[in-house]
């Protein structure tokens, strides 16, 4: 039974270190699952740091994951969609590749930190949550076709003056899966995300001010059904939106107090629940949420440092 699983395994690893400038690690793991049988997981990591300014990391390997359709996606039960789970769902299997570079550039007597990352995942086996083939159904099925994920991220951070640091980050994603024989964008995955953070702490460390501006890229929604008027019940895509968060903190000897606000731009997703007035009807769906459902939120709080008391 899948609710009981025994997984003994063994792992071997080899590490090569050359003057702390080049490090190579190769590993191989073998496991036996009482449910899924035997599987082997290779992994390799390389780190090259020729100087204090630059370092490069790369990794590659295979990964496995046991799936639990409803436990991982129980939010989908908050709709009128019929749930169909194929009996032949297998363990997920994928190859993972990644490379990252870090630069520490001296600039005007300070250090500019730059980080670049790229990751690629290629699924060989995957549990697909198909909400496209039938708008009134959610179908958990085995992957039949391609499924992959590309992620690129760039981040820069610089202390312009004492106590003030500005950080900017941008992430671009390309995630696609085969649904009903068609390779499509995965729903609810934003195409990009941008982040700009400014943080300032007064010279004595008494006050701290944090401001974060976040840009969330648009994405795809599952296939819609047609209303009687001949129009779709919801749009096929959602647009990008911005969010502004602010927090002010006052530090004391053993405690601190903070006040702030989230989503100060006041953005709210319009009509997040489909057919909300008829929760027992065949068209009710509260699972198509992709953005905040509340406007600006304000808060105040207190922190205690127990280690100093």
State where each predicted segment sits.
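Membrane-embedded beta-barrel scaffold of Gram-negative outer-membrane proteins
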Residues: 49, 55-57, 88-148
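Surface-exposed extracellular loop regions of Gram-negative outer-membrane beta-barrel proteins
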Residues: 2-33, 39-43, 158, 162-174
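Gram-negative outer-membrane beta-barrel transporters
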Residues: 17-21, 114-122, 142-224, 303-308
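Residues on the lipid-exposed face of transmembrane beta-strands in outer-membrane beta-barrel proteins
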Residues: 10-16, 44-48, 99-103, 154-158, ...
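Transmembrane beta-strands of outer-membrane beta-barrel pores
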Residues: 6-8, 28-34, 60-66, 73-75, ...
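Outer-membrane beta-barrel channels and translocator barrels
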Residues: 19-23, 49-53, 94, 105-109, ...
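Residue-level signature of outer-membrane beta-barrel architecture
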Residues: 15-16, 30, 38, 48-49, ...
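C-terminal beta-signal and adjacent terminal beta-strands/loops
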Residues: 217-224, 249-309
């Amino acid at each position: 039974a899948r609710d009981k699983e025994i997984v003994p395994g063994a792992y071997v690893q080899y590490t090569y270190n050359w003057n702390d400038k080049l490090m190579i690690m190769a590993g191989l793991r073998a496991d036996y699952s009482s449910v899924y049988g035997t599987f082997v997981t290779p992994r390799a990591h390389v780190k090259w740091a020729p100087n204090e300014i630059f370092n490069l990391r790369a990794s590659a390997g295979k990964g496995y994951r046991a799936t639990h359709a409803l436990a991982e996606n129980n939010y989908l039960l908050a709709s009128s969609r019929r749930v169909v789970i194929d009996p032949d769902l297998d363990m997920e299997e994928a190859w993972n590749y990644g490379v990252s570079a870090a630069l520490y550039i001296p600039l005007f007597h300070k250090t500019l930190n730059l980080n670049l990352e790229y990751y690629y995942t290629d699924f060989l086996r995957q549990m697909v949550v198909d909400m496209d083939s039938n708008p009134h159904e959610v179908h958990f099925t085995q992957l039949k076709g391609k499924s992959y994920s590309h992620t690129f991220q760039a981040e820069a951070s610089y202390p312009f003056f004492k106590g003030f640091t500005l950080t900017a980050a941008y992430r671009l994603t390309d995630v696609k899966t085969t649904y009903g024989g068609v390779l499509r964008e995965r729903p609810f995955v934003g195409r990009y995300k941008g982040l700009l953070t400014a943080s300032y702490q007064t010279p004595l460390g008494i006050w701290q001010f944090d401001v974060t501006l976040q840009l969330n890229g648009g994405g795809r929604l599952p296939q819609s059904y047609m209303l009687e008027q001949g129009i779709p019940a919801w749009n096929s895509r959602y647009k990008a939106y911005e969010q502004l968060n602010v927090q002010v903190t006052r530090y004391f000897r053993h405690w601190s107090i903070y006040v702030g606000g989230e989503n100060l731009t006041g953005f709210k997703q319009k009509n997040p629940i489909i057919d909300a007035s008829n929760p027992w009807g065949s068209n009710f769906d509260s699972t198509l949420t992709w953005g905040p459902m509340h406007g600006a939120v304000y808060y105040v709080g207190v922190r205690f440092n127990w280690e100093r008391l």
